Amino acid sequence: FHKTYYHPSNSYIYLCGDMDVDEYLTFIDEHYLKDFDKKQIDSSWEKQEPFTEVKRVEEYYPVGENDSEEEKTYLSYNAVIGDSLDAKLYLGFEILNRVLFDAPGAPVKKALMDAQIGKDIQSSYDNGIMQPVFSVIAQEARDDQEDEFVKILEKNLAKIAKEGIPRRNLLAAFNYYEFKYREANFGRFPKGLMYGLQMYDSWLYDDEKPFIHIKTN
């Protein structure tokens, strides 16, 4: 596997910044690429078809020998969201994640916390894969809270889908992301690295679309 796929012929190289591009490409060739022969690598993939019904998976993890097993359950609700080549959906779910779960007073997180489902609620939007996955996780919950977790989550999402989201909440999320991207504020990570990773979210799946998510910025 490693010998087949971990090869320059199956790699993506990008340069970021004000530079002499020819100089850097020559350097990369002389110090890296020239030592390999080009070869054809089939790294194609097929989309996973939607499930015909909800799938429930139960797994176990270890706790300390002297730790109680009470309130150590992690409940996770997950759904595939389109594909990463849909730029509007990609950005839209970043906004929704902020509004519904991450922002102060986020309504769905608040509903779950008010019901004391677990000790904390986390959400994630994994859009770095072809078929992005949105997840909601209740941490350190009780075993018997699974049904209530699903019920409250689906009820609140259905209510929001029907009644909509207050305009001020959406504007706050828009402002949050506009500031983040205009200022290239990626915390401890250099912006050149983060731009590259964001390019890969589409470039890996369509050679003609490396910049669709960068253009959003």
Regions found by a protein language model. Name each.
Residues 55-62:
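Short amphipathic
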